[in-house]
Amino acid sequence: MTIKSYREDLMQLVSYLREQRQKAALDVTDWSMRALRGWLVWLHEQGYSRSTISRRLAAARAFGRFLCRQGALQVNPAQSLRGPRQERKLPHFLTQEQIHQLLQAPFPGTWQGLRDRAILEVLYSAGLRVSELVGLDLDDIDLREGFLHVRGKGKRERLALLGPAAQQALTEWLAAREAFLQQRRTCGTPAVFVNRFGTRLSSRSVGRLLHTYLRQTGIDTRTSPHTLRHTFATHLLDAGADIRGVQELLGHKQLTTTQIYTHVSTRRLRDSYRQAHPRA
């Protein structure tokens, strides 16, 4: 929240309270739970979005904390108010054509190109979080069996599967990695993916290289490394995969976290039906 928007939100609240109290000068007794609840109802009736109401409530809470620090209030009534439940946005994902274009974008004639192709293939094939990807060590890979040992959120461990294309890309990268590190005389790092200095690649670097290929292919630049994880899950469910299996592959603790992807698949199915069925 910027200072300007914070000030505007507070001034709107003050204006509302003045009108309700029918007085020009307010005091701390006007900053009550009842008054603030009425203000939230009024915001809703005026048609403000949930995100706008939440932002304005956050400004009111911050101002209430300030009044408490100054000794003007003993308790901040705004702190106990519950804001509107935010709508859960459907995850952004790529089509099969787009993911094919993206995976073909890195030039395999350089060590960076081999690395980048392996990164994109593994993100899509295994559905990894970018933090899980850059955290991979050589001992985490079993190319013969086609799986990765992944350390996910909350230190939960799981096995992630690799498809043939990802296995091939990773095999080619590991050979190039060894030659590159020998050339730099920095063979000590266990990291699977390294930067030009021979040290572990960062999550930010993965984001930057992805955007390079997005611009190159003309794919929506809102795409992030996490979009490939969304794409992985959506494509699996579109192809009829069991949601419990997808939950395990993603490393989700709760099934409800995975179910957001079923909404995406259902929406796509409905759109296809409306476009194709003569009586839809």
Q: Which residue ranges define each predicted feature?
A:
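Conserved catalytic core of the tyrosine transesterase superfamily
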Residues: 1-280
